[in-house]
Amino acid sequence: MPMFIVNTNVPRASVPEGFLSELTQQLAQATGKPAQYIAVHVVPDQLMTFSGTSDPCALCSLHSIGKIGGAQNRNYSKLLCGLLSDRLHISPDRVYINYYDMNAANVGWNGSTFA
């Protein structure tokens, strides 16, 4: 059930076609979870600053049932900052990513939970 959310001040017109699909496939590979359970939400055109400037930046979160922790999070940060840099031209030092290890009983899907 990984869910990746990107809030960014990058304009919608600068988000390349296929970017969400690419994030989905890369996260599936990185987490080892099926792409069918991965949700990606990119929210462009946000009023944001980072380090006091409105240069391109992103505030992100990755929620997952398991697969969250020290070494894994460093790998995700490298992957996701790389994609945000390559595709949206956001410098990695202008990205924060918060990681959330979700309890399966606290994640609803398809009329039930993952527990």
From Swiss-Prot:
Active site: residue positions: P2
Compartments in which it is found: Secreted; Cytoplasm
Any one GO molecular-function label of the UniProt entry: phenylpyruvate tautomerase activity
BP GO annotations: brain renin-angiotensin system; carboxylic acid metabolic process; cell surface receptor signaling pathway; cellular response to hydrogen peroxide; cellular response to hypoxia; cellular senescence; DNA damage response, signal transduction by p53 class mediator; drinking behavior
Enzyme class: isomerase
Catalysed reactions listed for this entry: 3-phenylpyruvate = enol-phenylpyruvate; L-dopachrome = 5,6-dihydroxyindole-2-carboxylate
Pfam family, any one: MIF
UniProt note on tissues of expression: Expressed in a wide variety of organs including brain, spleen, liver, muscle and kidney.
Entry annotated with the keyword Acetylation: yes
Membrane-spanning residues: none
One GO cellular component term: plasma membrane
EC number(s) per entry: 5.3.2.1, 5.3.3.12
Signal peptide: none
Highest taxon, organism lineage: Eukaryota
Disulfide bonds listed in the record: none
InterPro entries in UniProt: Macrophage_inhib_fac, Macrophage_inhib_fac_CS, Tautomerase/MIF_sf
N6-succinyllysine modification, residue list: K78
Keywords assigned by UniProt, alphabetized: Acetylation, Cytokine, Cytoplasm, Immunity, Inflammatory response, Innate immunity, Isomerase, Secreted
Positions annotated to bind substrate: K33, I65, N98
Sequence positions bearing N6-acetyllysine: K78
Family: Belongs to the MIF family.
Annotated function: Pro-inflammatory cytokine involved in the innate immune response to bacterial pathogens. The expression of MIF at sites of inflammation suggests a role as mediator in regulating the function of macrophages in host defense. Counteracts the anti-inflammatory activity of glucocorticoids. Has phenylpyruvate tautomerase and dopachrome tautomerase activity (in vitro), but the physiological substrate is not known. It is not clear whether the tautomerase activity has any physiological relevance, and whether it is important for cytokine activity.
Known partners and oligomeric status: Homotrimer. Interacts with CXCR2 extracellular domain. Interacts with the CD74 extracellular domain, USO1, COPS5 and BNIPL.
Protein name per UniProt: Macrophage migration inhibitory factor
Species for this entry: Rattus norvegicus
Gene that encodes the chain: Mif
